[in-house]
From Swiss-Prot:
This is Peptide chain release factor 3. One of its GO terms (cellular component) is cytosol. GO terms for molecular function: GTP binding; GTPase activity; guanosine tetraphosphate binding; translation release factor activity, codon nonspecific; translation release factor activity, codon specific. The keyword Protein biosynthesis applies. Residues 11-280 form the tr-type G domain. Increases the formation of ribosomal termination complexes and stimulates activities of RF-1 and RF-2. It binds guanine nucleotides and has strong preference for UGA stop codons. It may interact directly with the ribosome. The stimulation of RF-1 and RF-2 is significantly reduced by GTP and GDP, but not by GMP. The keyword Cytoplasm applies. It comes from Shigella flexneri serotype 5b (strain 8401). It comes from the Bacteria. Keywords: Cytoplasm, GTP-binding, Nucleotide-binding, Protein biosynthesis.
């Protein structure tokens, strides 16, 4: 069966994001992936602040100063016969809900683990989000050029802590100064590592066969024997790769390598284009939309301000779900039921914008937004439906925000509501007083809000600590019981930026007690946009 040109384009697309704990090497991997995709000629390895070769994917002013990626940018590059869309996710302590929401716009994730440290806190949280949609996961064990933990231990830890089976595809030979390369379990080939070649794509020497005497000569008899012994254990004690289980999010293929040394990244990329799914169907509130449909649909998962310091603009990022975007197309914004002509959509290579003539399912478009587009907005060619599964997450950090000039209360509220629509932060207005409480998932969100209030709304604000540990959105099917709950808990209720009722708890114990006391009230940790 020959596919139509449209379906061929759809089948070529792979859209993925990288999830990791800060400093596990995510930005370096992003660089190397782009190098293999020929999107950049030499990888601008991320160094300290003095280095002038800033990594291509870190670009807002604050990021340049801090050497971190705050904003989720999008990069498209060709690899083999595929077109890959890589959505970069903020990695540092300073990550935000954007990171979570970006994971709702991809069909697959690459989990990067620092092999010296194993599974870390942020990785756990991000994996929980991928679980909401059983997203397929590939795993890259990074930093093999350093001393690492025992590889079998690492696999056990991933399986036990993240509840996903591991299927090793490559296996390391030594580590640190003794790192010699990796063996590919399914190709029966050993790839030999040379250090100092990290900035370019290196020619790799390959030794075929596990019992080939050349292997002993290349890595030394001891390491060669150790490899054979370890592989006996691996083959006996780990999962075989099974594509169906991978696509169901039940097992993850595991690759070993060093992103800094640019070694092993291509094995992972080959796995990605071979196994990761082409654009997947999506649920709406009325039906499932298939990528093969010819009518255009898409949803907004993130809004970013100030991508162009010369213009104070915002860009809404839209994931194309079905149909082909063409320049000058008329689309319906379902929430407002208005038709808009989109003539200047953008694609990105972090920071370099280019106007796009056409886009297909799996691609990400940037739409200019002057405050009319919100997160979760659905665009169609007229059909009235809304994509689901683009959540707000309950914040984990809270501050009270106060004005230096009390006369600017109106501007402050306007600014905060707009920033919350954009997903930069969440705002809660307690019912029992006039406080304004700002909730975030990462600390840096607070700095960003104050900086943007000042530059965009001319409002000077400061934070104070507030006795709030967590928030949950509340609802109840029984109106009478809900009224009683609201009456008795008025001092702990607040409205968010979209006027949804939330319970703000002073501690986790306080939240648990409230949940036990009011079993008919539902306390939600996420809320649909």
């Amino acid at each position: 069966m020959t596919l139509s040109p449209y379906l061929k384009e759809v089948a070529k697309r792979r859209t993925f994001a990288i999830i990791s704990h800060p400093d596990a090497g995510k930005t370096t991997i992003t660089e190397k992936v782009l190098l293999f995709g020929q999107a950049i000629q030499t990888a601008g390895t991320v160094k300290g602040r003095g280095s002038n070769q800033h990594a291509k994917s870190d670009w807002m002013e604050m990021e340049k100063q801090r050497g971190i990626s705050i904003t989720t940018s999008v990069m498209q590059f060709p690899y083999h016969d595929c077109l890959v869309n890589l959505l970069d996710t903020p990695g540092h302590e300073d990550f935000s809900e954007d990171t979570y929401r970006t994971l709702t716009a991809v069909d697959c994730c690459l989990m990067v683990i620092d092999a010296a440290k194993g599974v870390e806190d942020r990785t756990r949280k991000l994996m929980e989000v991928t679980r909401l949609r059983d997203t397929p996961i590939l795993t890259f064990m990074n930093k093999l050029d350093r001393d690492i933990r025992d590889p079998m231990e690492l696999l056990d830890e991933v399986e036990n802590e993240l509840k996903i089976g591991c299927a090793p595809i490559t296996w390391p030979i030594g580590c640190g100064k003794l790192f010699k390369g990796v063996y590919h379990l399914y190709k029966d080939e050993t790839y030999l590592y040379q250090s100092g070649k990290g900035h370019t794509i290196q020619e790799v020497r390959i030794v075929k066969g596990l019992n080939n005497p050349d292997l002993d000569a290349a890595v030394g008899e001891d390491l060669a024997q150790q490899l054979r012994d370890e592989l006996e254990l691996v083959k006996g004690g780990s999962n075989e790769f099974d594509k169906e289980l991978f696509l169901a999010g039940e097992i993850t293929p595991v690759f070993f390598g060093t992103a800094l040394g640019n070694f092993g990244v291509d094995h992972m990329l080959n796995g990605l284009v071979e196994w990761a799914p082409a654009p997947m169907p999506r649920q709406t509130d009325t039906r499932t939309v298939e990528a093969s449909e010819d009518k255009f649909t898409g949803f907004v998962f993130k809004i970013q301000a100030n991508m162009d310091p010369k213009h104070r603009d915002r860009v809404a990022f839209m994931r194309v779900v079905s149909g082909k975007y063409e320049k000058g197309m008329k689309l319906r914004q379902v929430r407002t039921a208005k038709d808009v002509v989109i003539s200047d959509a953008l694609t990105f290579m972090a920071g370099d914008r280019s106007h796009v003539e056409e886009a297909y399912p799996g691609d990400i478009l940037g739409l200019h937004n002057h405050g009319t587009i919100q997160i979760g907005d659905t665009f169609t060619q007229g059909e009235m439906m809304k994509f689901t599964g683009i959540p707000n997450f309950a914040p984990e950090l809270f501050r009270r925000i106060r004005l230096k000039d009390p006369l600017k209360q109106k501007q402050l509220l306007k600014g905060l509501v707009q920033l919350s629509e954009e997903g930069a932060v969440q705002v809660f207005r307690p019912i029992s007083n006039n406080d304004l409480i700002v909730g975030a998932v990462g600390v840096l969100q607070f700095d960003v809000v104050v900086a943007r209030l000042k530059s965009e709304y001319n409002v000077e604000a400061v934070y104070e600590s507030v006795n709030v540990a967590t928030a949950r959105w509340v609802e109840c099917a029984d109106a009478k019981k809900f009224e009683e709950f609201k009456r008795k808990n008025e001092s702990q209720l607040a409205l968010d930026g979209g006027d949804n009722l939330a319970y703000i708890a002073t501690s986790m114990v306080n939240l648990r007690l409230a949940q036990e006391r009011y079993p008919d009230v539902q306390f939600h940790q996420t809320r649909e946009h």
